[in-house]
Amino acid sequence: MTIMRKTHPLMKMVNHAFIDLPAPSNISGWWNFGSLLGVCLIIQILTGLFLSMHYTPDTMTAFSSVSHICRDVNYGWLIRYMHANGASLFFICLYLHIGRGIYYGSYMYKETWNIGIILLFLVMATAFMGYVLPWGQMSFWGATVITNLLSAIPYIGPSLVEWIWGGFSVDKATLNRFFAFHFILPFIIAAMAMVHLLFLHETGSNNPLGILSHSDKIPFHPYYSYKDLLGGVALLAFFFTIVLFFPDALGDPDNYTPANPLNTPPHIKPEWYFLFAYAILRSIPNKLGGVIALVLSILILALFPLLHTSNQRSLMFRPISQALFWLLVSDLLILTWIGGQPVEPPFIIIGQIASLLYFSIILLFLPIAGMIENKMLKW
């Protein structure tokens, strides 16, 4: 008798993706983040769904509806904090996942990598719009500042901003459409994640050595299914520690003040996971230049496959490139710190140097290091 999972049209798809999938025998814990991102997305969709049952996207009642969720709805406070901190967890996993991709040369699977970049943009857009919904001070002013950046686009800029706002300022129409987009985008992200997985399974997973593993494959289940399960348990333990003990550690106190268009907060800043890009934006003393640098800071990921000069795929045996990779990580941490600081000396110059270094490492130093390492292997 044939096994049902191998013949049933639906189960066959699941079987090929999660059960009988041939996987390299040596992939490490860094390969867990794909499944962890899936867990994060499910948490966000479920908590978001329950929040939307009680939330009202209206400037007059949005703030009080969030307050009502936290005070009056059964476990509303838990759902709200899970959703807010779930976003942070999502980005932690996302950045580690991208870092893994850069370190081990996974970007050489170009289709998978490019869909990953689109996914990153979608997740960033979703998170930004979600931050606007509680209609606190930082929600309102964050929305005003970030949407206003589009006015730097020549000719169509000002009209484009008013079109997005649905008026002459961030108001009821803006909040309403942001809620609509914030609700629909996670489902688009889920669909894109399926495409991401589809392209990955065309080639099979990369591995830490960056070499072909066709001769040494093991079935995904039970080996990696249990490994992913362990990762998920560890992730949830970390997640609930933050949610239950430090729920406001990653948020901004200004967002507990209702939005007031007549009172600007002293320091307008986005959530921590956007601070590196915000620092790059602010490091250029020109509006259009800053916006271009902001977009390029993420879009530069698309250049990784083109700038790969080494004969080896992974950084496993490339000490110069390894040093540059960790310099890049340190640089991003410095940019994150600078993004949360006021625009005054010495933070301005630190931000400018860190921004220049960020682009230099990716566009210049890493490709040169690859060529040097090729020469070293010949000697």
UniProtKB/Swiss-Prot annotation:
Heme b b562 binds at residues 83, 182. GO terms for cellular component: mitochondrial inner membrane; respiratory chain complex III. One of its GO terms (biological process) is mitochondrial electron transport, ubiquinol to cytochrome c. It is found in: Mitochondrion inner membrane. The chain crosses the membrane at residues 33-53, 77-98, 113-133, 178-198, 226-246, 288-308, 320-340, 347-367. Binds 2 heme b groups non-covalently. Keywords: Electron transport, Heme, Iron, Membrane, Metal-binding, Mitochondrion, Mitochondrion inner membrane, Respiratory chain, Transmembrane, Transmembrane helix, Transport, Ubiquinone. A ubiquinone binds at residue 201. Its main location: mitochondrion. InterPro entries: Cyt_b/b6_C, Cyt_b/b6_C_sf, Cyt_b/b6_N, Cytb/b6-like_sf, Cytochrome_b, Cytochrome_b_C_euk/bac, Cytochrome_b_N_euk/bac, Di-haem_cyt_TM. It holds the Pfam family Cytochrome_B. Its cofactor is heme b. Component of the ubiquinol-cytochrome c reductase complex (complex III or cytochrome b-c1 complex) that is part of the mitochondrial respiratory chain. The b-c1 complex mediates electron transfer from ubiquinol to cytochrome c. Contributes to the generation of a proton gradient across the mitochondrial membrane that is then used for ATP synthesis. Heme 1 (or BL or b562) is low-potential and absorbs at about 562 nm, and heme 2 (or BH or b566) is high-potential and absorbs at about 566 nm. Belongs to the cytochrome b family. The cytochrome bc1 complex contains 11 subunits: 3 respiratory subunits (MT-CYB, CYC1 and UQCRFS1), 2 core proteins (UQCRC1 and UQCRC2) and 6 low-molecular weight proteins (UQCRH/QCR6, UQCRB/QCR7, UQCRQ/QCR8, UQCR10/QCR9, UQCR11/QCR10 and a cleavage product of UQCRFS1). This cytochrome bc1 complex then forms a dimer. This is Cytochrome b. It comes from Perognathus merriami. The lineage of its organism: Eukaryota, Metazoa, Chordata, Craniata, Vertebrata. The gene is MT-CYB.
